[in-house]
Amino acid sequence: MVRIGTPLTDVATRAMLLGSGELGKEVAIELQRFGVEVIAVDRYSNAPAMQVAHRAHVIDMLDPKQLRALIELERPDFIIPEIEAIATAELLELERSGFNVVPSARAANLTMNREGIRRLAAEELGLSTSPYAFAADFESFRDAVSSIGVPCVVKPIMSSSGKGQSVIHSDGDVERAWRYAQEGGRAGQGKVIVEGFVDFDYEVTLLTLRHAGGTSFCDPIGHLQVDGDYRVSWQPHPMSAIALGAAQDIAEKVTVALGGCGIFGVELFVKGDEVYFSEVSPRPHDTGLVTLVSQNLSEFALHARALLGLPVPLIKQTGASASVALLVEGDSSRVCFSSLEAALCHPEVQLRLFGKPEVHGKRRMGVVLAQSENLDEARKLAQKAVDSIVVELGPDIKQE
């Protein structure tokens, strides 16, 4: 029997978010709907989830001592990693001492870098993947590129949102790609993965939910990425029955191996009826933002239910839906948005502004969600709304 206490009392059920971006913000909101006390943690102040949490902390989550000290201070019932850049070896130790890591410390540890999860999928589970090799220095990197062949994709083994990711088209790109990968890694310089191209027809995210009643799948989500970062997603993406069955089989094998309860974003390449494993995130996925309108229960609501041990009787898709990221480019900590009336004049359009405190370079600051009679119309509707939003980047005020 699930028991939830009253927030801010000695019987509170406490959840700690490690990572407090826009995805963590939605998880925090869903947990609070069930009366869970939410503690938001990140490496910077005023992160999106901090703005809706009961309280917040700023620490270096890659520092195992800081991480342990905070967790032992707060004693949360649930530790919920929302990003990769965490001292996951310490999470393994904390789990062994009795803390509950969602979905599991093993899942967080294996997926914090691309090497752990790729070796699990390809070498232990025998799943089809793109050709790959790992490199820890420039010499081994050059050998890996030669072995895989060009064109190939280079990624830091630990990064997100496409940071440090590039494509090598010729020998002249090798040194540039290595430098870029070293600059883009979440934990600084380190290993990279070199991946051969899969000649795929499309790629999808299959949101896979492990919960008290078993394993459930959301409808496939199609998406467009630019520079390795999500820009547009839509649901349901059409797949043949054979390909869908293969995708679900791969997703179930990977998530069973990772263990625990919660939502997993399983990324797959599809060519005809053949399906190749790409990556998995043991948490809500950015392409899954579309589920805020496309399903009766969003990926965030599903994650909350699963980790709390609550039932998920039915995941219902509500029609052709799309999301388009609101990408802002510039340098400012005084960002404003206007012309929202134009963006929201259609009855089937919704907007989420994430409340991120600043932008330096390019940053996803919001998302538009739309539904229509078909996917093309939903994507056009969402894009039109994004295009109508005016972003104002005010000059930073110098502190005396």
Curated annotation (Swiss-Prot):
Keywords: ATP-binding, Ligase, Magnesium, Metal-binding, Nucleotide-binding, Purine biosynthesis. GO terms for biological process: 'de novo' IMP biosynthetic process. InterPro entries: ATP-grasp, ATP-grasp_carboxylate-amine, ATP_grasp_subdomain_1, PreATP-grasp_dom_sf, PurT, PurT/PurK_preATP-grasp, PurT_C, Rudment_hybrid_motif. Pathway: Purine metabolism; IMP biosynthesis via de novo pathway; N(2)-formyl-N(1)-(5-phospho-D-ribosyl)glycinamide from N(1)-(5-phospho-D-ribosyl)glycinamide (formate route): step 1/1. It comes from the Bacteria. N(1)-(5-phospho-beta-D-ribosyl)glycinamide binds at E22, L23, E82, D286, K356, R363, R364. ATP binds at R114, K155, S160, S161, G162, K163, G164, Q165, E195, G196, F197, V198, E203. One of its GO terms (cellular component) is cytosol. Residues 119-308 form the ATP-grasp domain. Signal peptide: none annotated. Involved in the de novo purine biosynthesis. Catalyzes the transfer of formate to 5-phospho-ribosyl-glycinamide (GAR), producing 5-phospho-ribosyl-N-formylglycinamide (FGAR). Formate is provided by PurU via hydrolysis of 10-formyl-tetrahydrofolate. Belongs to the PurK/PurT family. Homodimer. This is Formate-dependent phosphoribosylglycinamide formyltransferase. It comes from Hahella chejuensis (strain KCTC 2396).
